């Protein structure tokens, strides 16, 4: 049997950047550096960073007041940044630039009077972060999706979770 390896392989640039930011924070400030959500969905990388002093948490409230935190590549809703300010946390935002682009597009389209449908996986950190940017409706499974009661004349924009494959997106639209 032949095995073909796709090129390129590995992490996307946004994930590499996020990992680098955690390592830079650890090198510059020393441990502990808290990481809001796994920096990447890879247990080997997470374990390696934790061995260097990174502490992964799921909620901002788990982080001691005044500590340093890196928000993951997946992005976070504005409420997380507000909670971090209230706790006087030193925030390093490692949100992937492509995810930030989706966040900015969501805000722009809502500002233009459009409705937004987000295609993504319910509960995924990126989806949570994106849905926190503006009012939108999530399509996770088109078989279970109930169309919102929107005026048929209202313009609609469809955005997608950046980590979805083309096939996943096609199945949802």
Name each region found by the language model.
Residues 1-173:
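The feature marks the mature, well-folded catalytic cores of soluble enzymes
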């Amino acid at each position: 049997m032949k095995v073909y390896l796709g090129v390129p392989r590995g992490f996307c640039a946004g994930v590499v950047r996020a990992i680098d930011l955690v390592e830079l924070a650890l090198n510059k400030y020393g441990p502990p550096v808290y990481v809001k959500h796994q920096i990447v969905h890879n247990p080997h990388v997470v374990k390696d960073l934790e061995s260097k002093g990174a502490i992964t948490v799921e909620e901002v409230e788990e982080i001691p007041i005044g500590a340093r935190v890196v928000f993951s590549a997946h992005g976070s809703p504005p409420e997380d940044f507000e909670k971090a300010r209230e706790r006087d946390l030193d925030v390093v935002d490692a949100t992937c630039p492509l995810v930030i682009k989706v966040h900015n597009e969501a805000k722009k389209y809502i500002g233009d009077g459009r409705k937004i449908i987000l295609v993504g996986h319910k509960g995924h950190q990126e989806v949570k972060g994106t849905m926190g940017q503006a009012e939108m409706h999530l399509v996770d499974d088109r078989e279970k999706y109930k169309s919102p009661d929107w005026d048929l004349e209202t313009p609609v924009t469809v955005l997608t979770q950046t980590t979805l494959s083309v096939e996943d997106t096609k199945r949802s639209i």
